[in-house]
Amino acid sequence: DIYSTILDAPVIEASSIKIAETAKMYENVQRDVLIALANEYADFCKSEGININEVTECAASKWNFAKVNPGLVGGHCIGVDTYYLMKRAKDKKRRMNLVQTARHINEAEPKKVATQIKNYAVFINAQRILLLGFSYKANTPDCRNTKVADVYNELKRHCLVVDCFDPLVDTKKVSKDYGISIIHSKEEVQTDYDLVVQLVNHNVFNEMGFTDATFIKLKDL
């Protein structure tokens, strides 16, 4: 009754708080598993020379296909609840084999993405790289558990010259939490980048042009 007085959204009643929390966990874990499948299927498609984006669109023509795109899994829900579930299951002497496998796949994704960027940079002889987006998902300043940080650090580990631009995030908080200096305004972005990689789909990036550099999105790596 309290929620219905303060929320405009429909309120779904559960018989107990345990049911409600377990349902929310199920939703997050299911998405983690589906993204892991998309990531693994994308790898298969790439090995076959097939475009995963077109495959996904075609498959989505069937009404009951769960349209999930491959990508990085960060944030404070999807990649976190999975560990709560596995710990709870372990306490009950149960194993969540599928869930654990999905988590391994998604945890490996940042390193894989960094390797793809590095290889592409070598292919086009790019000396300077700009990453677009730092938050864990599009159109939010929230950087909790963002996997862009892992991609950035992996690229730096390979001694590449890399900057990251995100006009939505709190740069001081990013510096404190991750030790990474983020470019916050478009005016600060230099014009001598050879490769620009969009990792987060902020709408604001649609209004910007990077005509002097090779531009690529995460989904096209």
Language-model region placement:
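Structural/interface elements that position substrates and couple domains in central-metabolism enzymes
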Residues: 1-221
